[in-house]
Every structure is written in structure tokens, then in C-alpha cells.
Amino acid sequence: EAAIKYVAKLYLDGGIDGIISYGGSMGAAISSAVMQSLPLGVPKLLLTTMASGDVRPYIGTKDMCLMYPIAEAGLNSLTKQILTNAAYCITGMANAPKVSTKDDRPLIGCMMFGVTTPCVLRGSAFLEDKGYDVIINHAIGTGGISMEEMIEDGYVKGILDITTHEIADELYGGVLSAGPNRLTAASKKGIPQVVAPGGLDLLNFGTLESVPEHYIEDVRNNVRKLYKHNTSVTCVSVTPEEAYEIAKDMAGKLNGAKGPSVLCIPMKGWGACDIRTPDKALGWAGPAEGPSWISDPEKPEWSLRSCRYVQGIKEKIDLNKDEMEVLIADYHMNEPEFSDLMSGILYDMLQGTWKKGKKIRNKSIFPVKEERLYAIHKAGGA
């Protein structure tokens, strides 16, 4: 704590242009905490023998460079060259020219995962064409945490929160959790937010062997499905009942919003793996339905998971708020029309022209309160 305060004062007084440290686990633990306390953009270089392994505790969500120094201490013909390289690295960064910010455009946040890429790329391109810069964070846990921090620190002026799957990992034990505060900063800050359940059809784990046994047992009993993305990433599907609980969690967070907030729910799937019919343009080439897809018995083109999610949202969301809206969309997450819906709403919010109900223009988009959605679902059904 003393080091954090001391270095902060040095930085504020203009006494340092960068920071470098060298050590083992204890040295890395102390120095990385100091580095994490400094603003983004300040050069940070951490040399540690702990660099070969899980480095999340050291990096956190800051822009730190990590270098494996081979040895923990001592000077010899090898370490002299390594430390010289490190010294030139940090001095090079410290002497880098300051980037001009006079022509900077307002920054918009966006969350992406592989399964939501088409939606995100189209939406971000639209906003960039409208004069905004877009920062796209990878929704792998640290990405969500850093997005929340950037919003809290005032960098982000609005968020296109397409990919919220980190919430499922937090609630049900996946490895890509962003913690319990995901989806809270925009509400507290009062910035415009347009949200979707992108990627919430999957829980994420490492190798197949790392998937908890109770989930493997569910797969054997056809309670959920398993998708082996690659040798390092294995996913299991979120059940409709879990989606119902996730919806209530998200609704509770959105209820605290101090600014304009819209939740858009695509009923035909939440990502590339959640699709009824193969479509390369939407991210799934087949040959069969996506590995997390579950058809609603009464409306097979809709996802049962989406229907249960909507029920959870309707039970918990506060639609009496003038700046809160929930829209049901008869689209898949990665269809161009759905991306245009979300980015268009956010643009209207940023321009100050958004009004509740403005985007409800055709039979494919309607507010969650419309009872026709529930005519085929008994209370607590599905």
C-alpha cells in the first residue's frame, strides 16, 4: 500500500515516465499491484519467473508488458543481456511520443466473443461511420472487468453490450467469469446502454477433462449439450431454467440504470452455436443445427432458452421506468437486422433522439409486455 501511494505521487508530480520491476513471485505480487494502480497508457514492464503460467493475478486488466527473465536473480553473461533488453524496452516506451487527443472521437464500448462476431463487427462499423470510436473487448472475464472499469473511469460514453455470456460463467461456474459486477457500471454511471444475451447459451471451460463432473453427467442424461471448440476450450449448453435465472439476475442489474437502457432479445438464437439451421454468414456451417440449439415445442423456429429467458425478464424488469425498454426480436443474434436494431438504438441515445417505442416499426420487433408472446406458454411453462 505504501508503494502504491508513493508511486502515485511520483506519477502525479511528473517524476516518472514508466515503471519496471524484476523478481520472483513475491516481487511480482508487490510490483504488479503498483503497476495496476497506474493509469492506462503509462509504460509498465514486469520481469518475473512467474510469467510462464497463469498470469491473470499479475496483469489484472491493465496494459502491462510481461517478460520471462530466465533467472530470478544474479548477473551473468546471459542475464546481463536480458536485463539490458528490458531496460531498453521500458526506456523506449517511456520516450514514445504522446499521441494527440485533439481529434479524438467519443469512445463507445462493445463486448465480443467468437460466436457474436458478425453482430459486433456490423454494429461497430455503423457507429464508426457515424463518428464514434469503438473499443471491442474480448468477453473472456478480464475483458468484461476492464470494460466495467473503463466505464467507471469515464472513458466510455455508451456501450453496445452485445456479448454478456460472462454472466452465465459467473452464476454457474464457468472459467470466463467477469465477477458479480458485470453489467453494473453503465447503469451506475448513467451512460446509454443497449444490451443483448450474446453467448449466454454456453458455459465455458478449458480442456474436456476440466469440465465439472456434474455437467458431464448432465450431458450423458441429455440435460445439456457439450461442444468441444478446440483442444483448450470446451463448452456445455445453458439449460432453459438457467437462462430463466440469468434473466432475473440481468433484470435486477438493469433496474438500477440511471440512463437510457434497452435490452434486445433475439428469439432465433444467441450466437453461432445457438442456431436451428446452418448458415455460414451467421457463424455456423453445420452440417446440423448448432451444438447448443433447443427448439421451443410450440414455436420451433424460436429457441426454448430464449422463451424462458423472456419469462424471467418479464417477471423482474421494471418497465415503468421511462428510460427502460425490452424488445423481442424475431431474428438470430448474428442477422444484420438485429445488429442494426441495437446499433441504431444506441446511436439515437447518443444523439438524444431516442424515445421508448421508437424502433417498434414492424412485426419482427415488439415490446416484451405484449401478451401475444405468452399466449402459447403457460405460467412457469416450457
Q: Model segments located where?
A:
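Metallocofactor- and cofactor-centric catalytic cores in central/energy metabolism, strongly enriched
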Residues: 1-97, 101-188, 193, 205, ...
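Redox- and metal-dependent alpha/beta enzyme cores, enriched for Fe-S-associated oxidoreductases
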Residues: 145-146, 196, 200-231, 273-278
